[in-house]
Regions:
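A structural signal for long alpha-helical coiled-coils and helix-turn connectors
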Residues: 22, 26, 116-120, 160
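Short, contiguous alpha-helical
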Residues: 8-12, 19, 27-84, 127-175
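Acidic/histidine-rich alpha-helical segments that form the ligand environment
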Residues: 77-126, 140-145
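Short, charged, low-complexity loops and linkers
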Residues: 1-7, 90-93
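Hydrophobic alpha-helical core bundles mediating ligand binding, dimerization, or RNAP-core interactions
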Residues: 7, 11-18, 22, 105-112
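Helix N-cap and loop-to-helix transition residues
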Residues: 2, 25-26, 39, 86, ...
Length: 175
């Protein structure tokens, strides 16, 4: 399997899990346990905003899909993406319209797929800006998308378990 193929397969798995994580009531998706944490809704918003920023702004050097219109449609903050966000602010993140949010998620994932469909191994070596300097495109995707998203998938499954909900992708025989 090529490196690009590996990335595509890993992101496909993460995206399916994140899509499945949208299933639940508003109360379940916005549940925050005592002692602080994020909600499932926060995890969904954060992972999608991160992917949008990495693929579109950093790698493709174009505007992100997110704009004020998506904020209005979903009820989410127009600014920010969750990194460094205090728990109190994170717990206020609320997705008012999950269908609109799902449309944003799908648009971001489609942009990522278009990039990966034409990317080469040389593209993965190109340096792009990061919060601490630069990193390769491959590092940005593997660290901040593949690894990070699967960490949030575990967080989502923990939050679902605390509410007696099935894990994401349980119907597919995995989690």
């Amino acid at each position: 399997m090529s490196t690009i193929g590996f990335i595509k397969r890993g992101l496909d798995f993460a995206h399916k899990a994140l899509a499945d994580a949208r299933n639940g009531t508003g109360e379940q998706l916005h549940f925050v346990p005592p002692n602080g944490s994020h909600s499932i809704a926060w995890c969904l918003w954060h992972t999608t905003r991160v992917e949008d920023l990495i693929i579109n702004a950093r790698i493709l050097k174009q505007p992100t899909i997110w704009n004020g219109e998506w904020a209005k449609r979903t009820g989410l903050p127009a600014e920010g993406f969750g990194v460094g966000q205090p728990d109190d602010d994170a717990q206020k993140v609320h997705i008012d319209d999950m269908d609109a949010f799902a449309a944003y998620q799908e648009a971001v994932w489609a942009a990522t797929a278009r990039f990966l469909d034409t990317a080469t191994d040389a593209d993965l070596e190109r340096e792009v800006p990061s919060r601490t300097g630069t990193e390769s495109v491959g590092e940005a995707i593997s660290l901040h998308m593949l690894g990070h998203f699967n960490g949030h998938r575990g967080e989502i499954n923990t939050l679902r378990g605390m509410q007696d909900m099935p894990t994401v992708m349980a119907a597919q025989g995995t989690h």
